[in-house]
Amino acid sequence: MSFAVRGYIERIDSELVVGWAYDFKSPNQPVEVQVRQDSRILADTIADLSRDDLLEKGIGSGRHGFSMTISNDLCNQLYRGEAEIWVSDARSESWYRIAELRELN
């Protein structure tokens, strides 16, 4: 099964979650990113920050980056697996868990 949405986390620390998320079926529309614990939304943002590295790799317009401010406690919950990061498609009809922490290659 292939998903239309792809997202990656590149950094998690005591203040920020940084990454990118992109809907291949709606390349000009930003997607929503959420940190969840069970069904509770603990933090959210829109992936619409401009990034030259995404543009150079041919990932849409390059405006698919995100940087989300989080608390130190939420950072620890993410590292312990007690909270997860999810991304929607551009229509917010489907949600996908981002399970990978990696750099864009």
Language-model regions, residue ranges each:
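Basic, ligand-binding patches in group-transfer machinery
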Residues: 1-105
